[in-house]
Amino acid sequence: MVPEDVYQSKKSELLYLQKVTGLTDTLKAQLDELSKQVHQMHDNAECVSSVLKNWDSILNSISQATLSLLQYTENDYEVGAWSNGSRPEADKEPPLPETLVRVNVANESQE
């Protein structure tokens, strides 16, 4: 081989390797950004998970409050139903749902 041909071959190989290096650096930067986004998605998923853990107790509390209202009839909510004199003074207010109290039921070891 002529030294000029070897030189041109090595030069084209060098250009090719520089192009591959540039593409590799770009890919590395994109993968680093993707890694950050996946980590952020993981953190956000943990937050959503902790919120969703409470939904069972929230729905249970709403259900209990709703069930406590079922003991009253439609007449209990009518205007003037308390002024007929047949009810004590304490019952002259319209019936309200039971007061809900928040109680932490999580184990101390989970926190």
From Swiss-Prot:
Coiled coil: 17-48
One Gene Ontology biological process: positive regulation of microtubule polymerization
Statement: the UniProt record of this protein carries the keyword Isomerase: no
Domain of life: Eukaryota
Stretches the record annotates as Disordered: 80-111
Keyword vocabulary terms for this entry: Cell cycle, Cell division, Centromere, Chromosome, Chromosome partition, Coiled coil, Cytoplasm, Cytoskeleton, Kinetochore, Microtubule, Mitosis, Nucleus
UniProt family annotation: Belongs to the DASH complex DAD2 family.
Functional description taken from the UniProt entry: Component of the DASH complex that connects microtubules with kinetochores and couples microtubule depolymerisation to chromosome movement; it is involved in retrieving kinetochores to the spindle poles before their re-orientation on the spindle in early mitosis and allows microtubule depolymerization to pull chromosomes apart and resist detachment during anaphase.
PANTHER family: DASH COMPLEX SUBUNIT DAD2 (PTHR28036:SF1)
Assembly: Component of the DASH complex consisting of ASK1, DAD1, DAD2, DAD3, DAD4, DAM1, DUO1, HSK3, SPC19 and SPC34, with a stoichiometry of one copy of each subunit per complex. Multiple DASH complexes oligomerize to form a ring that encircles spindle microtubules and organizes the rod-like NDC80 complexes of the outer kinetochore. DASH complex oligomerization strengthens microtubule attachments. On cytoplasmic microtubules, DASH complexes appear to form patches instead of rings.
UniProt-recorded name of the protein: DASH complex subunit DAD2
Organism: Eremothecium gossypii (strain ATCC 10895 / CBS 109.51 / FGSC 9923 / NRRL Y-1056)
